[in-house]
Curated annotation (Swiss-Prot):
Family matches, as PANTHER family: STRUCTURAL MAINTENANCE OF CHROMOSOMES PROTEIN 3
Modified residues annotated as N6-acetyllysine in this record: 107
Free-text note on domains in this protein's UniProt record: The flexible SMC hinge domain, which separates the large intramolecular coiled coil regions, allows the heterotypic interaction with the corresponding domain of SMC3, forming a V-shaped heterodimer. The two heads of the heterodimer are then connected by different ends of the cleavable RAD21 protein, forming a ring structure.
Span list, region Disordered: 1050-1070, 1330-1437
Acidic residues bias spans: 1385-1395, 1420-1437
Location within or outside the cell: Nucleus
Designated name of the protein: Structural maintenance of chromosomes protein 3
Every SMC hinge domain range: 522-636
Disulfide bridges in this chain: none
Record's keyword terms, sorted: Acetylation, ATP-binding, Cell cycle, Cell division, Coiled coil, Mitosis, Nucleotide-binding, Nucleus
GO biological process: cell division; mitotic sister chromatid cohesion; regulation of DNA replication
Subunit structure: Component of the cohesin complex.
InterPro entries assigned to the protein according to its UniProt record, in alphabetical order: P-loop_NTPase (IPR027417), RecF/RecN/SMC_N (IPR003395), SMC (IPR024704), SMC_hinge (IPR010935), SMC_hinge_sf (IPR036277)
């Protein structure tokens, strides 16, 4: 066994070791690495898994073990080691397994695979594999070598005791002493209890005799009681017959009264139907009357409004006509004034033109005169010039100036001419605008007139639609009222059906309707009652009786659909439903007789349905015939043996029974459902009609909205046109004003142009005169002719100017007059005339006349409607009076029928209660009779009533009273006297045996303590001898030529080297006074010629080497599967390192070594080198070659302190002087455990065989009796319990046996003569200890029981022992001695478990078959499971 892989995650410096493809070598593995890389943490992880590392139990201690780097700490971690278990050193049936220890702040657990283990399980597993807690030197830590080197002699002795297992012996001794003390205490208690039980047994013996007398009296009492019950049963039977006859009378009477009540009920129902119908009609007429009255009020209001509107239009017409006359008068007056002004203007125009012509002539003349005058004046003024040249120059300059003026005038004239043309065009444009405005105004007036006519037509249409909307509203309101009534009737019928049906069915149907509405599940046809119609209504009661709850069975297409619905109902835990899947239901054709008359027909013929539901209908109604009367039904039933039913619901069953009677029609589910169906159809039809009416109303409202929208549009257009007319009038006024203004401007510009042309011409004439003068001779004086001309011209000029002033004044007056008249014509008369014309056009008296006519027409129509409404109102009042007169006799009839039905119903209720009372009495007497007959039958085998027939009931009661008085005197008898007597006797015998066992076990324990002391001394001596021998041999191997030995020291040995050498002890002899030794000394010599010296005289390296030699000696004496060595060569020099390395390499043939080092010697001898590296915050163990490991060491060897000359152990050295490793010194403990496990297994086997024999015997004796079956069942239960315990003990034995063999034990066969007799005392001691442990719990349980509460029962109580026999029971007979001798010889033999297991299985199978025949097999499993805990608790001892 060795370590193959190591996986570490989250442990100290190891973040995640991960998987390495190279396994650890089963020999010598050497680990190197830098300081702080994680070598020691690797060993700590292995120790953590093996349980050697001391870790606290709190979370803080485990937190210290978790990997932490860079401030990040892992939450969990684990250490896992894969072990090679090919030698099966571990008690696991695997050649390889992995053990993991997972830890964190909140958990710490071991596991192998998926199986979790406790720390104790892991510790036991390692101890079984040879990791003894008494020899912890398979892990050598840093500093442990130094501790061994500096250890005192007394400490070495303690270490040797620990290795030898002395501590185990001490623990066993303490346990044995505790058991002895407990046994003595229990023995005293048992003696006291025995005295009490002996006294109690004597009392119970007397009570047993009283109990026998009591039981005899009880038996007589039961016999008389059974006889009295027999007599009472006969009396009950007679009473039942009388009650049945009385019930039959009431039943006949009730049937007659029921039919009578049914007849009255039908009449009452018809009268109530008529009454309700009349009430409904009255209510309807009353509602209609209210609506007609409201309609009359509406028409009156409408008529009043129309009259008011008509008066308004009349007033409006009168005002419009008055205004029109006034406007026309003003228009005529203004038109005359306008014509007069126009005539005056026409008169003024010629005069004005003539004066303007005269003015122009005078201007021409004056201009010519002025020009001539100017020439003469110039000529006259020539005296100022000295010469012609000067004169000509002056004239030339003046001509130039005048030419410039002429040019300017011509430009101005040209501009004026252009302005005049523009003014003329503008004037034309304004004229066109005026004409267009006038035309547009006329067109808009026509449009307004047309719009008004269209609006009037639309309003008429709107009024008609409003009337239709009003009537439709009335119809809808009436339909809604009827719809509410229908819905109330529908819901009332549904509530009535719910009260009749049971609640689960009602809830189921409600949920079914919801499922159908959701539509997620297809194929639901609905309840059967929905799927047919009743052809003959009088057969409703018959269908109700035959259908029953089957009426509400749900018809579906397949059973899968039914399963889906049921799943929903079960999930929601609501309702119950039954289903008829059409794919499953099949019916046989009924054997009906040939029907030759109309008195009988199949019930299925009175309904109609879809052919797909034929099978479903046949399933419910197909087996019954409906008959006209009872006689026919009885005749058909007898002749054809089929079920028949009458229309009254009386059923004549084919087997002879007849059921029927009164059925309240209010409680008939089918009738209620038909009512639901009727009102639902009425509701749906009315709902459809209401929807159509509402749709019609929506269309009318849409039309009304459209017309109103059109009216608003037309009115908006008219208002817009009227608004535009106002704007047009303003625009027209503006056009007229602008036109007048442009005319005036044109006239002014023409005048200015004319004047400007005259000035231009004058200037030109002046220039021509200057040119003429230039051409004339220079003369400074005028001629006489010229002077006269000058005088004449001067006078003419004055006259002309005077004339011009006069004419200009006249022109201005006429022009002003003309302008005034023109302005008055255009601004006043024209504008006002246009306004008057617009106002006249805006006035529309024809429209008012039309409105008056329309309103009158509407008033006439309203009058017609009012007359019709009043006639209808009178008709409704008359109808109400007629209905009131008609309903009164019906009300009287209803009251009388109610009184009669109430009387009959009360009588029927009384008869029903009487029949219920009779039925209850019959049932009560039936129960009494049946119970008494059952009691008589159950006791008929025990009692013989022949002897008691001489007694009647009274005499029997008298005898029973006498027996009861006798029993009263014995009422305090102890009913459990027999059981208690047997129980106390058994307890007495058991306690005697227990007391004897305690005496025997105390003696055995004392012998065991003595034996353990001897064993301990032998173990210490044997261990010391082996360690001393191996120490000497190891030291010689490490130091050739050297010698060393271990010596035992006593108190008188002062020197460290003094003491006894184990070689001086005889073989197998334990030195006397071993416990007087005080320590173990060491004497060593490091070569020939060297004196032996003690540890105190050695150097540090030598002490280390001696300590290593001692460790190797311990390892050879008690080897472990592998060893962990942490830098054990740290204090050695090169030669010693080489010696230690070679020795480890030799030991690694059989044992795995994992060592850390800083030197090259271990590296050279290693089978596999490993290097610990620290990278990225975590340590990792990686395989390396020898060169890689040496490079790491050389990097650390800064001072070249190591010697690298050693090349490893040679093959010759490796094979020379192979060390022989010893066997663990605790072999005898393994043998002890083996014997104890074997003893337990044999004891369990014996108990199981005994129980098996009892069970087999009971199987053979079993009969059909229930008691024998129960006994066999009980025996089988006990055997299964003991069989399971045996299997557990056998498995435990096999595990211990394997370990025993692994430690060198030999399994002997039965009857082996070589069995040592010396083992018998120890075996007996072991047996007594086991008995003591098994009986301790039994004794404590026995002491807790109270004697009076014992319920133990035995078939035959054992014979009680007398106190004088107590001492004889302690001794053992010769037969018992031989039996124990035989058992002792079998203790080390093997157990053949195949044969008993096979036999046990056969017995169990046979018993199971027996029990299965009696129906008891099913209960065994639960009972067996209840006993599992008891078995497991028994197996844990």
């Amino acid at each position: 066994m060795f370590i193959k892989f190591i996986f570490i995650k989250g442990f100290r410096s190891y973040k995640d070791q991960g998987f390495t493809s190279i396994t650890l070598h089963p020999g010598f593995n050497v680990v190197t690495g830098r300081n702080g890389a994680g070598k020691s943490n690797l060993f700590a992880a292995i120790r953590f898994l093996l349980g050697d590392l001391n870790v606290g139990n709190n979370s803080e201690d485990r937190l210290k073990l978790l990997h932490s780097y860079g401030g990040n700490t892992m939450q969990t971690g684990y250490v896992e080691i894969v072990f090679d278990n090919s030698d099966h050193r571990f008690p696991i049936d695997k050649t390889e397994f992995s053990l993991r220890r997972t830890f964190g702040t909140s958990k710490d657990e071991f596991s192998i695979g998926n199986n979790k283990l406790s720390k104790a399980d892991v510790r036991n597993m390692f101890e079984a594999a040879g990791f003894s807690s008494s020899n912890p030197y398979y892990i050598v830590q840093q500093g442990k070598i130094n501790t061994l080197a500096l250890m005192k002699d007394s400490d070495r002795l303690d270490m040797l005791k620990e290795v030898a297992g002395a501590t185990v012996y001490e623990e066993r001794k303490r346990e044995s002493v505790a058991i002895m003390i407990e046994s003595e205490s229990k023995s005293i208690k048992i003696e006291e209890f025995l005295k009490y039980i002996d006294e109690r047994i004597k009392v119970l013996d007397k009570e047993r005799k009283e109990l026998q007398l009591y039981q005899t009296q009880i038996e007589m009492k039961k016999q008389f009681e059974a006889y009295i019950i027999h007599l009472e049963a006969n009396e009950s039977n007679d009473r039942i017959l009388d009650l049945e006859k009385e019930k039959e009378k009431y039943l006949i009477h009730s049937s007659k009264e029921s039919k009578k009540l049914e007849r009255f009920t039908d009449e009452l129902k018809k009268d109530e139907s008529k009454f309700n119908k009349l009430l409904s009609e009255i209510k309807k007429i009353d509602n209609e009357k209210i609506m007609v009255e409201k309609l009359n009020e509406v028409f009156d209001k409408q008529k009043a409004q129309l009259v008011i509107q008509q008066k308004h239009f009349k007033k409006l017409l009168s005002k419009e006509q008055a205004k029109l006359e006034k406007l026309q008068k003003e228009q005529d007056l203004l038109s005359g004034s306008k014509e007069k002004l126009e005539k005056e203007i026409e008169i003024i125009k010629p005069k004005l033109e003539e004066l303007i012509g005269q003015e122009d002539d005078i201007d021409n003349k004056l201009s010519s005169t002025e020009r001539n005058l100017q020439e003469l004046y110039v000529k006259q003024g020539m005296f100022q010039f000295k010469s012609k040249t000067e004169r000509d120059k002056y004239l030339g300059d003046e001509s130039s100036k005048l030419e410039d003026i002429v040019n300017q005038y011509e430009q101005q004239a040209q501009s004026l001419e252009e302005d005049v043309e523009d003014m003329k065009q503008i004037q034309q444009s304004k004229g066109k605008q005026f004409d267009n405005s006038m035309a547009s105004k006329d067109k808009e007036a026509e449009i307004v007139k047309t719009a008004e006519l269209r609006v009037h037509e639309l309003k008429l249409e709107k009024d008609q639609i409003e009337q239709r909307v009003s009537s439709t509203f009335q119809s809808i309101n009436e339909m809604k009222s009827n719809l509410t009534e229908h819905r109330n009737e529908w819901k009332k019928a549904e509530r009535n059906l719910q009260t009749i049906m049971n609640r689960p069915l009602s809830e189921g149907l409600t949920r079914l309707n919801q499922i159908r509405q959701e539509g997620k599940i297809k194929g639901i046809h609905g309840p059967l009652v929905e799927l047919f119609d009743i052809v003959e209504p009088e057969a409703t009661l018959a269908l109700e009786v035959v259908g029953g709850n089957g009426l509400f069975h749900v018809v579906v297409d397949t059973d899968d659909t039914a399963s889906k619905i049921l799943e929903i109902l079960n999930t929601e835990n609501i309702g119950r439903l039954s289903f008829i899947p059409l794919n499953r239901v099949r019916t046989k054709p009924p054997k009906f007789p040939i029907l030759e008359n109309d008195l009988v027909c199949p019930l299925i013929k009175v309904i109609s349905f879809d052919p797909i539901y034929t099978e479903a209908m046949k399933l419910v109604f197909g087996k019954t015939l409906i008959c006209k009367d009872e006689a026919t039904a009885e005749q058909v039933r007898k002749s054809s043996h089929v079920d028949c039913i009458t229309f009254e619901g009386d059923v004549f069953h084919s087997k002879g029974a007849v059921t029927g009677g009164y059925y309240s029609k209010k409680k008939l589910k089918l009738s209620s459902y038909q009512q639901i169906k009727h009102w639902r159809q009425q509701y749906q039809q009315l709902q459809t009609q209401l929807t159509e009416k509402e749709s019609e109303l929506e269309k009318l409202q849409a039309s009304l909205l459209s017309i109103q929208k059109t009216i608003r549009t037309k009115e908006d257009e008219k208002n817009k046109i009227l608004s535009n007319n106002d704007n047009s009038r303003v625009e027209l006024d503006k056009i007229i004003s602008e036109r007048t203004m442009y005319i005036e401007i044109l006239e002014k510009k023409q005048t200015i142009l004319k004047k400007l042309k005259i000035d231009i011409q004058n200037c030109k004439d002046t220039i021509d005169g200057y040119q003429k003068q230039i051409n004339t001779a220079f003369n400074t004086k005028l001629t006489e002719e010229e002077s006269n001309l000058l005088l004449t011209l001067s006078e003419s000029s004055i006259q002309l100017k005077e004339q011009k002033i006069s004419i200009s004044s006249d022109v201005m007056k006429l022009q002003s007059r003309k302008n005034q008249m023109t302005n008055q014509l255009n601004q006043n008369y024209g504008k006002r005339l246009m306004e008057i014309e617009g106002e006249i056009k805006s006035l529309n008296p024809e429209n008012s006349k039309l409105q008056i006519e329309l309103k009158q027409k509407e008033i006439d129509e309203i009058n017609i409607e009012i007359d019709g409404v009043r006639e209808k109102l009178e008709s409704l009042v008359q109808s109400l009076n007629e209905k009131d007169a008609e309903i009164k006799p019906i009300k009287v009839s209803i009251d009388a029928l109610k009184q009669q039905t109430s009387t009959i119903a009360d009588q029927l209720v009384a008869d029903g209660k009487k029949m219920e009372s009779l039925l209850a009495q019959i049932q009560s007497f039936n129960k009494v009779r049946d119970a008494k007959q059952l009691r008589v039958l159950s006791k008929g085998d025990r009692f013989n009533f022949e002897e008691l027939k001489k007694y009647n009931k009274d005499q029997s009661v008298e005898e029973l009273n006498k027996i009861n008085k006798s029993l009263a005197s014995l009422r305090h008898v102890n009913q459990k006297a027999n059981d208690q007597f047997n129980s106390f006797t058994n307890q007495y015998n058991s306690l005697e045996a227990r007391r004897d066992e305690l005496y025997e076990s105390n003696a055995s324990i004392q012998l065991l303590i003595k034996t353990l002391d001897n064993k301990k001394d032998e173990a210490i001596a044997r261990t010391f001898s082996g360690v001393a021998k191996n120490f000497t041999q190891v030291f010689k191997e490490l130091i050739p030529g050297g010698s060393a030995k271990l010596v035992m020291k006593r108190q008188m040995d002062e020197d460290e080297g003094e003491g006894e050498d184990p070689k001086e002890w005889a073989d197998g002899e334990t030195p006397k006074g071993l416990l007087t030794f005080t320590g173990i000394g060491i004497q060593v010599s490091f070569g020939e010629g060297h004196e032996p010296c003690s540890m105190r005289q050695l150097s540090g390296g030598q002490k280390t080497l001696v300590a290593l030699a001692l460790i190797f000696a311990l390892q050879r004496t008690d080897p472990a599967p592998f060893y962990l060595l942490d830098e054990i060569d740290a204090a050695l020099d090169h030669n010693y390192r080489v010696a230690v390395s070679k020795m480890i390499r030799k030991h690694s043939r059989e044992i795995q070594f994992i060592a850390t080092t800083f030197g090259p010697e271990f590296v050279m001898d290693a089978n596999q080198n490993w290097i610990v590296v620290f990278n990225k915050g975590g340590s990792k163990l990686v395989p390396g070659s020898t060169e890689d490991a040496l490079n790491v060491i050389k990097q650390l060897d800064n001072g070249s302190a190591f010697d690298y000359s050693y090349q490893g152990i040679t093959e010759e050295e490796f094979n020379q002087d192979r060390p022989v490793l010893g066997v663990a010194e605790n072999k005898h403990l393994v043998a002890f455990e083996f014997k104890r496990a074997k003893k337990r297994a044999l004891k369990a086997l014996a108990k199981a065989e005994e129980a098996c024999a009892i069970m087999v015997q009971d199987e053979a004796n079993q009969d059909s009796n229930a008691d024998s079956s129960e006994k066999l069942k009980h025996d089988k239960k006990i055997f299964e319990k003991l069989h399971k315990e045996y299997l557990l003990r056998a498995a435990e034995f096999n595990q211990v046996k394997e370990r025993f063999i692994r430690f060198g034990g030999i399994i002997k066969q039965q009857g082996d003569d070589e069995l040592s007799q010396s083992s018998q005392p120890q075996d007996k001691e072991m047996e007594n200890i086991e008995k003591e442990k098994d009986n301790n719990q039994q004794t404590s349980d026995t002491e807790m029981k109270d004697t009076d509460q014992s319920t133990t029962k035995q078939k035959s109580p054992p014979k009680r022992k007398s106190p004088s026999q107590d001492t004889s029971d302690i001794e053992t007979s010769d037969d018992e001695s031989k039996k124990k001798q035989t058992e002792s010889n079998q203790e080390e033999s093997d157990i053949d478990e195949e044969t008993p297991s096979q036999r046990f299985e056969e017995a169990l199978n046979y018993a199971s078959q027996k029990l299965k025949q009696h129906g008891l097999q099913e209960s065994e499993q639960s009972e067996q499971e209840e006993d599992d805990d008891d078995i497991s608790s028994d197996s844990s001892d």
